[in-house]
UniProtKB/Swiss-Prot annotation:
Places the protein is found: Endoplasmic reticulum lumen
Role summary: Required for protein translocation and folding in the endoplasmic reticulum (ER). Functions as a nucleotide exchange factor for the ER lumenal chaperone KAR2.
Short sequence motif Prevents secretion from ER: positions: 487-490
Residues bearing glycans: N258
Cited PROSITE patterns: ER_TARGET
Organism the protein comes from: Kluyveromyces lactis (strain ATCC 8585 / CBS 2359 / DSM 70799 / NBRC 1267 / NRRL Y-1140 / WM37)
Protein name, UniProt field: Nucleotide exchange factor SIL1
Amino acid sequence: MRVKCVNRAIYVLTVLLFSRLVVSQVVLTPSNSNADPKQKDTANTVAAVEANNDANIAKKDAESDLVIGDHLVCNTKECYPIGFVPSTEWKEIRPGQRLPPGLDIRVSLEKGVREAKLPEPGSENIGNEEEDVKGLVLGAEGSTLSESELKETSEDLENEQSGFKLNNAEKESDILQQETDLKIAVSDNAEATSNEPAGHEFSEDFAKIKSLMQSPDEKTWEEVETLLDDLVEFAHDYKKGFKILSNEFELLEYLSFNDTLSIQIRELAARIIVSSLRNNPPSIDFVNEKYPQTTFKLCEHLSELQASQGSKLLIKRFLSILDVLLSRTEYVSIKDDVLWRLYQIEDPSSKIKILEIIAKFYNEKNEQVIDTVQQDMKTVQKWVNELTTIIQTPELDELHLRSFFHCISFIKTRFKNRVKIDSDFLNWLIDEIEVRNEKSKDDIYKRDVDQLEFDNQLAKSRHAVFGNPNAARLKERLFDDDDTLIADEL
């Protein structure tokens, strides 16, 4: 029992030394050369446990498949800020995050992660041992050593190991020296890092583009076009696309929107943006969060292209960017009046793309933005008319039919009687419900759960959305329990 108390006290003093460090990667062991070998072994065991935890954390970082940009760190599941935001409570340091200086940092032996928080007021007073010891967590069980237990354990330690005494003044001096050395090392490292240019594997290519733009002529723009053409190939890659976009989006946006440049250069820059965004959620989230005005800029430049009868290919690129950005957002808006004017262009593929954008904007996920924007109901009615017309086209595929139908239903539910639905659409809806009811009798058709779910929504919407809601409720009661329905209700 006494040996356990001795070991426990040694552990407390050792962890107390570790808690004063300002850099989480550095692990210090007691430097008292007068301590006997048994005491040193105990301290070394604690240091080994901490080192092992650091190794496990490093291993997790290596296996997390991180993509690190200037502002975000992304893995296959989520993105989070690259800068650690401290608070007064212990917070986990996420893989790849950068820490501001001056934080209290520890390794949680219970969780196996690094944690940091803002220093406590007056924590600079290293001699205040009682405050340092309070709340100190010991072992994986999370037990806490109280002041009375610490005093009792210290007395047992002095009786059992009379030869081992740690002088408070020497300890304070040792810790102060360690902190001074570490601050110097961190300062030197930060200075060295600040002198290194921030870069990525394509930074030389973009640096050359920027250099060529300083002295523009026909030859230099040809070189810029060649460089952009080479970069298009890499933009399709998940990781490389994010690196390009997170580091060079402003340059690519400038090249795309600059109407003084050739269509070839503008189109290539826009194509790099589209390729970096497509099927790349971290890239989409990065642009939406850091550059939320991009969708408005796209609408403005689309309006200019439409007014000047500009390149149809560039229009398609801008529409594709807008379409992808709207696929993962609840915080950006569009100018649907601009899109309506653009919709008048006689280009079937562009018309479909514009309707896809409208279907993404008028959606339940985007309701917060729609509530804050003054809607022109004349334009909204025009979109409803177009959607209800094109959805009746026999050649329209199932995916577009579902997307357009959900949009029509949302607009009708959201704006109610302010939007009118023509009888042709209602007749088509009745016929479509009957056709799908017949198909549902087929065993193979029944296997498609998503298809049956959509067919059910289609049937319910006939009265619940586009008709009389009371009739819908009556129909449900007839279907669920027609035996109990009284004659008056029929």
